[in-house]
């Protein structure tokens, strides 16, 4: 297969194309894309489309609408005591870290409750090994089991709770029930944009059909039935210092070693990659505007799409190098695309219309510039010199008769 596709829906496939052409402008709010056998099938659900819609009402519908991540302390608005229940693994952990720092900068009080034990090996990794930044900013850090949240926080009362941990009702219910009984005024929940059903009309927007049996959906329904003031946030992929789940690093690993970058399918699949500061600023906007946020679901993403090929090119530009992209059919080669590639092999793109309409929120993600910062840190920590094995890549490249490295 050719290194770069010869045709593109929105931009030239040539590596010399302006970087600005690699990003899809938010003005393209509604468009139809040619589907392929792999475009949306992985999000199909056995439940009917009618049963997939949540029974509670949403105010939103399909309508138009630098590395340092601090904000100036503001004297406007009520200062609140916020509890963040934070996961101890995965890409979402960094959301709680950024959110805590932004809240502290805005003058709020913050306690971050991390699942598990402070002495565990997980706490030696980012963002947990940077929690001193939260403490130095005036925040508190505690560890424990969210099912026993009252005991962990020692009876302290809070105005706002964010659950950035649970993926199912069994995990989240104890926190919701405790929050309600203890007088918490606002409950925020980190859900996932992965709960949307496949669509022939991307992007996903708030109000689109979801998979009714998905754990996050069940939690959202319980919140709607139980809590007076609640809001749910559905993120996608993210980048940012302190993230412990690979995103841009996957591309950098190959680019700095002059290896071809294998991307399944055409490489034109759209996705959304946000800087985590966008996610934290959206959450902070909800804390500042609780009535506007109440009872709503927000796609917690930036406002521009990028293609999979485009992400590879942007990462190469950030590293000051060229990139060879090779496309492949996972089934024909006999590899599992989920293991060989870090993103979904399909259009997976949501837009943050509700946050713009209801909260007056604006995205600050700028992938070309953000990726330059990320590459600087990548080199600073020495990952560009780390020994890395590429067994699946080698299998793919061998099948395509492509040299492993230039």
Curated annotation (Swiss-Prot):
Molecular function terms from GO: mRNA binding; poly(U) RNA binding; rRNA binding
Top-level taxon of the source organism: Eukaryota
Subcellular location: Plastid, Chloroplast, Plastoglobule
Gene Ontology biological process terms in this record: chloroplast organization; circadian rhythm; plastid translation; positive regulation of DNA-templated transcription; positive regulation of translation; rRNA processing
A GO CC term attached to the entry: stromule
Phenotype of the disrupted gene, per the record: Lethal when associated with CSP41B disruption.
Record key words, sorted: Chloroplast, Phosphoprotein, Plastid, RNA-binding, rRNA processing, rRNA-binding, Transit peptide
Keyword rRNA processing: yes
Positions carrying Phosphoserine: 266
Disulfide bonds: none
Presequence extent in this chain: 1-72
Keyword Cytoplasm: no
Family statement: Belongs to the NAD(P)-dependent epimerase/dehydratase family.
Purpose: Binds and cleaves RNA, particularly in stem-loops. Associates with pre-ribosomal particles in chloroplasts, and participates in chloroplast ribosomal RNA metabolism, probably during the final steps of 23S rRNA maturation. May enhance transcription by the plastid-encoded polymerase and translation in plastid via the stabilization of ribosome assembly intermediates. Required for chloroplast integrity. Involved in the regulation of the circadian system.
Subunit structure, interactors included: Component of a complex made of CSP41A, CSP41B, ribosomes, and the plastid-encoded RNA polymerase. Interacts with CSP41B.
Name of protein: Chloroplast stem-loop binding protein of 41 kDa a, chloroplastic
Organismal lineage: Eukaryota, Viridiplantae, Streptophyta, Embryophyta, Tracheophyta
């Amino acid at each position: 297969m050719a290194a770069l596709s010869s045709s593109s829906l929105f931009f030239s496939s040539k590596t010399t194309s302006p970087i600005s052409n690699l990003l899809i402008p938010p003005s393209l709010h509604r468009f139809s894309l040619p589907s392929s056998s792999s475009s949306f099938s992985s999000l199909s659900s056995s439940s009917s489309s009618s049963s997939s819609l949540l029974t509670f009402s949403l105010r939103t519908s399909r309508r138009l609408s630098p590395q340092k991540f601090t904000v100036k302390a503001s004297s406007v608005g009520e200062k609140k005591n916020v509890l963040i229940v934070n996961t101890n693994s995965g890409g979402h952990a960094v959301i709680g870290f950024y959110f805590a720092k932004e809240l502290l900068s805005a003058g709020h009080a913050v306690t971050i409750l991390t699942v598990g034990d402070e002495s565990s090996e997980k706490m030696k990794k980012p963002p947990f090994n940077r929690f001193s930044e939260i403490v130095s900013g005036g925040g508190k850090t505690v560890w424990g089991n969210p099912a026993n949240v009252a005991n962990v926080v020692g009876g302290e009362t809070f105005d706002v709770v964010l659950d950035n941990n649970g993926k199912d009702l069994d995990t989240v219910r104890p926190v919701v029930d405790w929050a309600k009984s203890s007088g918490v005024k606002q409950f925020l929940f980190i859900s996932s944009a992965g709960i949307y059903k496949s669509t022939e009309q991307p992007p996903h927007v708030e109000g689109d059909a979801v998979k009714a049996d998905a754990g996050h959906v069940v939690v959202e329904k319980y919140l709607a039935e139980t809590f007076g003031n609640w809001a749910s946030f559905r993120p996608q992929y993210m980048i940012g210092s302190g993230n412990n789940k690979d995103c841009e690093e996957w591309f950098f690993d190959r680019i700095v070693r002059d290896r071809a970058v294998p991307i399944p399918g055409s490489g034109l699949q759209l996705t959304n990659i946000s800087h985590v500061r966008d996610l934290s600023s959206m959450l902070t906007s909800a804390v500042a505007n609780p009535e506007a946020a109440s009872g709503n679901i927000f796609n917690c993403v930036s406002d521009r799409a990028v293609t999979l090929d485009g992400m590879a090119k942007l990462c190469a530009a950030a590293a000051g190098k060229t990139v060879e992209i090779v496309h492949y059919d996972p089934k024909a080669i006999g590899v599992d695309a989920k293991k060989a590639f870090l993103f979904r092999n399909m259009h997976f793109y949501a837009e943050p219309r509700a946050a713009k309409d209801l909260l007056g929120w604006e995205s600050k993600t700028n992938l070309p510039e953000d990726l330059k910062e990320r590459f600087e840190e990548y080199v600073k920590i020495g990952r560009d010199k780390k020994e890395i094995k590429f067994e699946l890549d080698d299998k793919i490249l061998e099948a395509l008769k492509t040299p492993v490295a230039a």
